[in-house]
Regions:
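HIT superfamily nucleotide-processing domains
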Residues: 1-103
Length: 103
């Protein structure tokens, strides 16, 4: 895991696989288990270090889903009280802001 170079919040990190492959659906069962285990370990450290009120976990698969790096990585983003006006919605609000994307 590494800290994101363009963090959304303090502690925003990336869980990155050793083996190179493009996206989550190419991961083996063992790799998915390793990602899950590391995510929990990092979360436990962040609970102590940053004391967040919650977390967002994100995986973008494909260019039109926002994937900009062609290597699987999972965003683990600590969330804090008051970090946004209204944290509800997440991707559920995506349909309200869809625009044509030609990347």
């Amino acid at each position: 895991a590494i800290l994101d170079h363009f963090p959304v919040n303090n502690g925003h990190c990336l869980i990155i696989t050793k083996r190179h492959f493009a996206n989550f659906f190419e991961a083996t069962e063992e790799e998915v288990k390793a990602i899950y285990k590391l995510m929990h370990e990092v979360k436990e450290m962040f609970d102590i270090q940053y004391e967040p009120a919650g977390y967002n976990i994100g995986i973008n698969v494909g260019r039109y889903a926002g994937q900009t790096i062609n290597h699987l990585h999972v965003h683990l983003i600590p969330r804090y009280i008051g970090d946004v006006d209204d944290p509800r919605g997440g991707v559920r609000n995506l349909k309200n802001s869809l625009v044509e994307y030609d990347g």
